[in-house]
Amino acid sequence: MEDMSEAAEMGEHLAVAQALREQLWPHLDTDAPRWVLALLDPNHPVAVHDPLHVTRLAQRQPPVEWLPVRREDFLSSPELWPQLLVLRAPDRSGWIDEPLLDLTVAHALERRTSINGAYVCGWLVTDRDPADIARQMKRALQQRMSFLQQRALAWFEPHRWALLMASEDARAWLRTAMAGVHSWSWIDLAGHLNETLFTGHNEAPVAGALTSADWARQQRVPQARQVVLALTKADIDLPADAERHIDQALLQADVLGLILLEDRLCFALHSVGIGPQWHRHPAATACIECATNGESTLADALDALDDETLHRIAITAGEHVGTKTSKEFMA
């Protein structure tokens, strides 16, 4: 059975890799010079024996190239800077190392729900020299908050990128910040291949263009990753657009007054794993009130309910009836 599972995973990797090639091809079927770059993030590292570790990449044949993207917040740790791995270049016929493309896809799929974040963040097509793209990214990673204050944001991480794509303001900013990029492909939490098409080619990045709502979504990402980990451990399939669904659940937890991290995570787990309306059942509402009043944790209050009530809460949710109990979620 284990061999069959590994074979199925390999088949999925190859299918997604082929889908990526087909997604990229319309941008490459031109006489204009085009590069295809994979973005690696050593801040979410891989083991030294991993074939995508830079020490292993240096041993590949044919030789491959990569360029660092300077991070002002990691000046003393250049080994953590993002790397732009060149997969295709105008002066080469076809892919420089086609198995390497397959390897990046397999890695992105395997790490998509990791609590530690993605190492392979995406693939971009550009008509600009990779060194120019690295300089653009360096500038765009620093967000101006005020005249004197800047904040770094690793917006290229797939989870963060997916949230930015849900914001019209953020999409407009990224189109400006990444002028010269025609396409950005990434794999989301559910394992789906996505593509962002860029239009407009303004020259200078727009500093500080993200709204307060965009920043709030980004600040919830660490909690969202804990929700993803718990859902994965509970063997719950992540829905399409999981990044947005989880963020909306965490935001709703804020609105309802849930302060403790444990309560917020419990609320989000039920919202995604059972259904977004679960908290509207009177018994669920009472449990939430117990948590906000400090009488008990949300998980303990829910676990005190009988099976029939839990079943009715699941029906209220309108999604997956009776999938998991609170204890199973939080184990």
Where do the language-model regions lie?
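A glycine-rich, hydrophobic loop/mini-helix early in the fold
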Residues: 90, 95-112
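Hydrophobic, conserved cores of late-appearing folded domains
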Residues: 75-89, 108-113
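A contiguous, surface-oriented mixed alpha/beta subdomain in the mid-to-C-terminal portion of proteins
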Residues: 2-61, 68-70, 79, 84, ...
